[in-house]
Regions:
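Glycine-centered hinge/linker elements that transmit conformational signals in sensory
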Residues: 101, 144-178
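Stable alpha-helical elements in mature extracytoplasmic
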Residues: 20-23, 32, 36, 79, ...
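Extracytoplasmic/periplasmic solute-binding protein
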Residues: 59-68, 74, 98-147
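Early extracytoplasmic/lumenal segment of secretory-pathway proteins
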Residues: 1-22
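Aromatic-glycine-rich donor-binding/catalytic loop that engages nucleotide-sugar donors
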Residues: 80-91, 167-168
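Short helix-initiation/N-cap motifs at beta->coil->alpha
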Residues: 1-2, 94-99, 174-179
Length: 179
């Protein structure tokens, strides 16, 4: 089991830890997370949080974790100086992305800094699927594994877009770590 100790080596009354996802349930089963329903009620978590987030913070119907942030990996990091040098604008669509990528490449900048580890490829693929197909398609194809969505023209477009994104990485990308 899990045992949290204070400075004196004995059990502690209070502790904080960054835990998320299924780990919240595991820690709660160990009995080391406090009931936070009073705080949740006072701060109106049930009204403010999406149900999926609220459910993940609860164990047996009680809040046992606080909603500190929601982290996504589908961010686009851009270098404004490189865009300025290339005469490109920050994209908001995939079509704009490819126009900008072409301009960056012509200006001598590698448009997509990307390693080739599996998790990086899948993260990029997820972002493309969401951007090309939208939230409903993403959920059907990648969460529910709906055969119709997986074999659809939208998935064909996702795959073609992903393949095109990869052409804007450098040849040394495969296997490179993210940092």
């Amino acid at each position: 089991g899990l045992l949290l100790e204070g400075r004196d080596g004995g059990p502690t009354d209070a502790a904080a830890a960054q835990i998320k996802g299924p780990s919240i349930q595991e820690w709660a089963r160990e009995g080391v997370l406090a009931n936070m329903d009073d705080v949740a009620k006072a701060e109106k978590w049930d009204e403010l949080l999406p149900k999926a987030i609220a459910d993940g913070l609860k164990y047996k119907g009680n809040y046992v974790a606080a909603p500190v942030n929601v982290h996504r990996v589908n961010w686009l990091w851009a270098n404004p100086e490189a865009f300025k040098k290339a005469g490109a604008k920050l994209p908001t669509t995939w079509d704009e992305f490819f126009v900008a990528a072409e301009a960056l490449q012509k200006a001598g900048t590698i448009p997509v800094a990307h390693g080739g580890q599996n998790w990086q490829d899948f993260t990029t693929f997820e972002s493309v699927a969401l951007g090309v197909g939208g939230a409903d398609f993403y959920k059907k194809a990648l969460v529910q594994l709906d055969a119709g969505s997986l074999k659809s023209p939208t998935m064909d477009k996702v795959l073609a877009t992903f393949k095109k994104v990869k052409t804007y990485t450098d040849k040394n990308a495969p296997g490179r770590d993210w940092n």
